[in-house]
Regions:
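Basic, low-complexity intrinsically disordered segments
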Residues: 66, 70-72, 76-78, 112, ...
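Charged low-complexity interaction tracts in eukaryotic proteins
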Residues: 56-97, 135-162
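DNA-contacting interfaces and partner/effector-binding or oligomerization modules
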Residues: 7-20, 108, 136-138
Length: 162
């Protein structure tokens, strides 16, 4: 009887398939926005990591609405003067995430924002994001007429906003 031989693989075997970022770019130029499953389908892969690797090669944005599930190209987004763009009720910002966008909007405002005002401006609920920004000392809040007015963390800027 021949001795039993055990072979060990030392390296992971990777598929030799080459993926191109152009497949993602073509899809996003045509449809303007897409979610991860569509991007994976356009590339012909089931691996999210592959899509993220190819997205790095492109100038792209993720939505601040819909938990960042939508993607678009910078060249497709028609950003307004306040740094926002929407397509089919999906919102994107030059500032990136909802936290960064809310902070930038409040800091740039002539006067602070009440939650409802910022909700209307950004078209999403901002209460939790504002609470986190205050907790992280990125913004402050002042009680005005029974409601919280959110202002910049910088004391000089905050005095101007009140």
């Amino acid at each position: 009887m021949a001795p039993l031989r055990i072979y060990k693989r030392k390296d992971a075997i990777m598929r030799p398939t080459d993926f191109s970022a152009e497949a993602i770019a073509t899809l996003l130029r045509k449809q303007k926005i897409a979610r991860m499953p569509k991007l994976m389908g356009a590339m012909g892969t089931n691996a999210r990591r592959t899509v993220f690797r190819k997205l790095k090669e492109l100038a792209y944005r993720t939505s601040y609405s819909h938990c960042g599930r939508y993607y678009t190209l910078d060249e497709v987004a028609e950003i307004d003067a306040q740094g926002l763009w929407s397509y089919r009720e999906v919102w994107f910002s030059v500032y990136g995430t909802l936290l960064s966008t809310a902070a930038a909007m409040v800091e740039a405002a002539a006067v602070g924002y009440f939650v409802e005002e910022l909700d209307n401006r950004l078209h999403v609920g901002t209460k939790d994001a504002l609470r986190k920004l205050v907790g992280d000392a990125r913004l402050t809040r002042e009680k005005v007429a029974g409601q919280f007015l959110f202002c910049a963390a910088d004391s000089r800027r905050r005095r101007q906003q009140l």
